[in-house]
Every structure is written in C-alpha cells, then in structure tokens.
Amino acid sequence: MQAATETIAAIATAPGRGGVGIVRVSGPLAGRIAVEVSGRELKPRHAHYGPFLDGGGQVIDEGLSLYFPGPNSFTGEDVLELQGHGGPVVLDLLVQRCLELGARQARPGEFSERAFLNDKLDLAQAEAIADLIEASSEQAARNALRSLQGEFSRRVHALTEQLISLRIYVEAAIDFPEEEIDFLADGHVLGLLEKVRTELSTVRREASQGALLRDGMTVVIAGRPNAGKSSLLNALAGREAAIVTDIAGTTRDVLREHIHIDGMPLHVVDTAGLRDTEDHVEKIGVERALKAIGEADRVLLVVDATAPEAADPFSLWPEFLDQRPEPGKVTLIRNKADLSTEAIGLEESADGHVTITLSARTNAGLELLREHLKACMGFEQTAESGFSARRRHLEALRLAGNALEHGHAQLIHNGAGELLAEDLRQAQQHLGEITGAFTPDDLLGRIFSSFCIGK
C-alpha cells in the first residue's frame, strides 16, 4: 500500500441542490478533521448525527459524520464522510473548513486513483465506477456493476494465468535445451495455446458488446438515391432531422443524429445515395458515405422494395462490398413496403444475414428494426452475463490476440520456441494494461482525470 502524504477533500455528490450532499476526505489528516468538524471523537464505521462546526465553533450544518480508518476504506486511507444538506453553499463551506484544517482540493478521480494505487481495486474496476455513474440504460448499468465487482478483471486474470503457465513451460524448454523438448511433437504447448486463444476470442466478443452498450453503436444508413434513407433516419429519430424529397440526390453530405432506444445510445449516420455522378459536390458526398460505411458498427443497406434492382440488393453498388464491414454487420432494409405487396417482417438466412421489410413513411415494421438494433448492441444479455468495457480495453485485447496469432504461426511453421516466448510475453503485457499491472503513468492520468471530482 502506498502511503499518501497529502489529505484531499471534495464534494462527492452531483452539482446542484438536493436533499443530501456529501463531502469526502481522504488522507492522514482525516481523523483530526473529523474531530474538529464534529466536535468529538468518532467511533470508526459508525454514523454520528450532530453539528458541523466552523473554526469559531459556529454551526455550518447538521448531519451524519462517518469515519473509516485505513486500510478498511474505499481509498485504503483514513476516510471521513460528512453527509449534510445538499445545498451548494453549505457544501462549499464544509469543503473550505476541511481545507483550513490542512486538506487540499481533490483532483477529478483522485479518490478512485488512490484506491487503485492502494490495491483496493484494479484499473478496470476503477473505470467501471465512472461507467456506472454515466450508464444510460439498465443493461449498461448492470454491465458496469459486474465490472466494478470484478467480473471483467477475473476474466483477464484467468487469461493471464494461462499465459504464465504457458510461458513457464516454453521458457523452461528454452533454458534447458538438453531436455530436447519438441514443441510440436509434444502437443502440450499447442493445446494450451489453442485454449487461451479460444478464451481470448470469447472475452473480446463480450468486451465488444460491453463497449457498444457504454459508448453507443454507430449505425450507417446506406443505399441508392431515393431508397428512403433519410425517411428511415427521421423515423428512428422521431423528428424531421433530414430533408426528404422525391428528387434523387437530395442528401449530399453525411448527416449525424444521436438517438436513444430504451436508453441505449445510438449514433445514426445518413449518407448520400450511392451512384455514379458527374456532380462534384455529390461525388464528395459519395466518398464520405463509403468512408462512413467502412467505420460503422452496423450498416443498414436500404433498398426500394418496389424497384426491379431490389431482387439483388448487394449488386447495386460494387464499391459497397469493398467498404462495408464483415457481412454479419450488414442488415438489409427493404423499404417502401406500403407501396409493394411484401409483408412486414424480419427474416434471418441460414448464414446469419438479416432482412427487415418495413415502411419508413408509415412506421410499419419500425419496431422490428429497433428490437434488432437493441439485440445487436447486446441488449438481450441477461443480468448474469456481460460486463462493461472501453475502447482502450478492446485495443489491448486486439493486440494480445495479434501476439498470440503471431506466436502460433511461428510455432506451426518454424517451431520457434524463442519467438513464441516473446509473443506470449507481449500478450501478457497487453492484458496487464487492462487491469493496470502494466500501465504508463500518463495513461493513468488521462483515465482518472476524466472522472468526476469527489470520485
């Protein structure tokens, strides 16, 4: 445990007025501040009701005082919580009193940072505190809570332990060549490597869902001109966010709209119609559309169900096939069902392709699309599954996966145990960045500075 030399104080509740407001203090002076502010010795881990006093003995407010001697506290240090009325003036006066007694104003996230430095929680758990506070849906809150309780960290630690076991075996074989262990003939190394690769792939998939729930999914609406893309955007947004006319090429640029479906964030992008054009401005719009398609989490390929070309929608624009994400991230939308004889509905092919027939003009079938998008974001996860994750976690998992893939290739094609050992070391280091076992100080500063003051 790292002993802090400074005592910090801050308001721990949200800005504004409320029934209850909390001032939090952490550090070696917390016990003395507790006595000075409450006017008496506090029994550890008990709530004491009474006045909060200023330097002249005048009452600032009345409320509960709770003192938690370290290391049995959130930060691992001596901690004091003053729970009074939630007026900003009263809370500011309490903080000023703590500063007069030797504390300093806490930086954003400094309480959580001290908890991390004192091994009360790891970095993924610390980030989950902020994710839980900022959760915009029940499922996102559940996932953040599971990460705070250590679910994500346990999965990462399990992977790390498997890597350590594998490294011990491989490096022992390298250090004692007289044993003449044949990595390929032995089969033990390959078996362990396959096991950790499979588990890492599962964790990456679940982490990706967790990141979508936290950050929101980027959905790009693409298709030919006049397929009803802007009408679909307006239907999802519930307002006239885009201009809709019968003139082909009305949308010439990328239009972004942020919406929520049952509290889940969605970043919807309307794009220019995909076609060959001599119009310079429209060409730029098409280029931007293709770029947006390549960056999307989900692409809604909209086709006019009444058009003859709708029979083979993926042949409408060959460049779309080059720019789109993997096939599983494309949903075909057969629009204008109110003008065709097609029934409203959702169909999923044997290879996993989803087609939704709807009418953006009448909103028929729109609820099917909403439910489909919720499922794509992991909304159907149960309370017992899933965890919160961030983009940096996904990058660390990706790099760890790349290292394992490279090590596997070296082992299969070259039987190179030395190179495999280095790849395993790199994979372990990337996983350590998630929990903070291997994390640069500048990254820690960026992470905790994004927290609320008082957290």
UniProtKB/Swiss-Prot annotation:
Residues reported to bind Mg(2+): S230, T251
Keyword field: Cytoplasm, GTP-binding, Hydrolase, Magnesium, Metal-binding, Nucleotide-binding, Potassium, tRNA processing
The organism's place on the tree of life at top rank: Bacteria
Role of this protein: Exhibits a very high intrinsic GTPase hydrolysis rate. Involved in the addition of a carboxymethylaminomethyl (cmnm) group at the wobble position (U34) of certain tRNAs, forming tRNA-cmnm(5)s(2)U34.
Pfam families xref list: MMR_HSR1, MnmE_helical, TrmE_N
Protein name: tRNA modification GTPase MnmE
EC numbers for this chain: 3.6.-.-
Amino acids binding GTP: 226-231, 245-251, 270-273, 335-338, 359-361
Subunit structure: Homodimer. Heterotetramer of two MnmE and two MnmG subunits.
Major enzyme class: hydrolase
Presence of the UniProt keyword Magnesium in the record: yes
GO terms (BP aspect): tRNA methylation; tRNA wobble uridine modification
